[in-house]
Amino acid sequence: MDIIFYHPTFDTQWWIEALHKAIPQARVRAWKSGDNESADYALVWHPPVEMLAGRDLKAVFALGAGVDSILSKLQAHPEMLKPSVPLFRLEDTGMGEQMQEYAVSQVLHWFRRFDDYRIQQNSSHWQPLPEYHREDFTIGILGAGVLGSKVAQSLQTWRFPLRCWSRTRKSWPGVQSFAGREELSAFLSQCRVLINLLPNTPETVGIINQQLLEKLPDGAYLLNLARGVHVVEDDLLAALDSGKVKGAMLDVFNREPLPPESPLWQHPRVTITPHVAAITRPAEAVDYISRTIAQLEKGERVCGQVDRARGY
């Protein structure tokens, strides 16, 4: 069994050694331009077209939860990967836990009004504020995939009213499910906190725009953990300036790194992190990949395969 590996920033030698330990029968090599030797599996992130084109691979593993970069490259270069080759993404591998930590910490930050107290502190103003009540602090999750379900589970511990919206209806205990565009307005109408965990598809690009934000309750909060292209940043800034949206926590942006001149940096109601909400944990990723390859070799059914038509 031959495995080729390509990632522009990961420690390639660490991955090769870890994969050797996890799959002793495999020959693992770092792919370099000009390498046209045969391979059974490819582990990639932002791969060059020539790495995958023309290969009779058993499967390709994207080394992250998102596959929009490889799918967009496939649209431009359909010869890059045969339609018969399954594409897998890292469904969790520790990312769910990281998303839980991020979401819970920020929801509690807003619920306890720490954002308001920070603004008061900046002006040396001492003033206790009325508390928020859980029953009025409904949390809505846009996107009901693996990571969305993990975030919902973690927030249930805090007894917030929860709802989710997705393409198809879900049956999550304790979570009110909304499905399809026809139910989006009803979903948004009660969301005091909107958490975005949607996949990046042509249908979801720019979905968080003026029209969507206007359907939220006054003084709502936005937490974007998915992709920057989901948010029309000018519309969000306008909603923040008007008070329609009281605060935003943003981990992803249309341009990354976020340009220094972006008004988001200095906005008093915006908190920024540099795309770190959930990163690939190498040891857990190697464990997932090795188990999945073992299942594929046995002809077993596996999880995590990307539906190229849907984009996730």
Swiss-Prot record:
It catalyses: glycolate + NADP(+) = glyoxylate + NADPH + H(+); (R)-glycerate + NAD(+) = 3-hydroxypyruvate + NADH + H(+); (R)-glycerate + NADP(+) = 3-hydroxypyruvate + NADPH + H(+). Its main location: cytoplasm. GO terms for molecular function: glyoxylate reductase (NADPH) activity; hydroxypyruvate reductase (NADH) activity; hydroxypyruvate reductase (NADPH) activity; NAD binding. Transmembrane segments: none annotated. Its EC number is 1.1.1.79, 1.1.1.81. The keyword NAD applies. InterPro entries: D-isomer_DH_CS, D-isomer_DH_NAD-bd, GhrA_Enterobacterales, NAD(P)-bd_dom_sf. It is an enzyme of class 1 (oxidoreductase). It is found in: Cytoplasm. GO terms for cellular component: cytosol. The keyword Lyase does not apply. Catalyzes the NADPH-dependent reduction of glyoxylate and hydroxypyruvate into glycolate and glycerate, respectively. This is Glyoxylate/hydroxypyruvate reductase A. The lineage of its organism: Bacteria, Pseudomonadati, Pseudomonadota, Gammaproteobacteria, Enterobacterales. The gene is ghrA.
